[in-house]
Amino acid sequence: VLDFSTASLTGAAFTSLLMRDRIARADAVPAEAKGTPHLPVKAKRVIHLCLCGGVSHIDSFDYKPELEKFHGKSLQSEERPATFFNQVGLIRKNDWEFKQRGQSGLWVSDLFPHIAEVADELTVVRSMVAESANHTPATFEENTGFRLNGFPVMGAWVSYGLGCETDELPSYVVLPDGRGLPAGGTINWSNGFLPAQHQGVTFQSQGPPIYDLFPSRELPVGSDLASRKLLEEINRRHLAVTGTEDALLARMKSYELAAKMQLAVPDVTDLKQETEATRLMYGLDKEETSDFGSR
């Protein structure tokens, strides 16, 4: 479970929002600082499914007929793939039959009969390779292009390029697997050296969508506002001593924007509002698909 500085109501989420909100209201600032696209764009949103240890490429979209000829034989090549303990297994043929689908003739295995029906709407990139057999650096490389951490992930770059349509929700949302985090943990949705508003914010599919968004107990009327004002005064005094700090300035507004998310999040995460057709499409009412469908 990801926990972003719960002391300031999931600080990363609100820091992301607040920095963008503060900058967007400033006069005469560059377009990139406002979170708006550098160039006109066609895409409105991007969904990236990160499947660590996912299905093999040669069992899905990468048809290699020569594998059947060498099935069960040792690899006869001086170029050795990266492996654990320097052990290379025997060559194995495809376990599913491949067919060319649609007008494009895209090769898709029988493992994906429904995806095969929309073959002409797909773009398959076969030129991407990993430089490590170790899950953690390989996952970093998939998400950032580098095996070492500290670089912005794909979602952060998309957020940086497309901006955000609302100031009530973060532009980059992460829907983690309930069974656990991927190899490398929360670094896989880091903003790296990009501004803080481009860091991924986790939404849970089960239980509260965002941890610590609401107080654990009901507070007396007005006490929440009084707490925010006290915290703001403490932070302003700190700024007067230390000088301008973007991160602190962002956090000073976090409780103010928390109210917006407290109103917006319950509505956008209420799947009971979905139509019967949508529930059927995402398998929300089936035990075997409800968890993934709700994400």
Q: What kind of region is each of these model predictions?
A:
Residues 1-295:
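Ligand-binding pockets and gating/stacking loops
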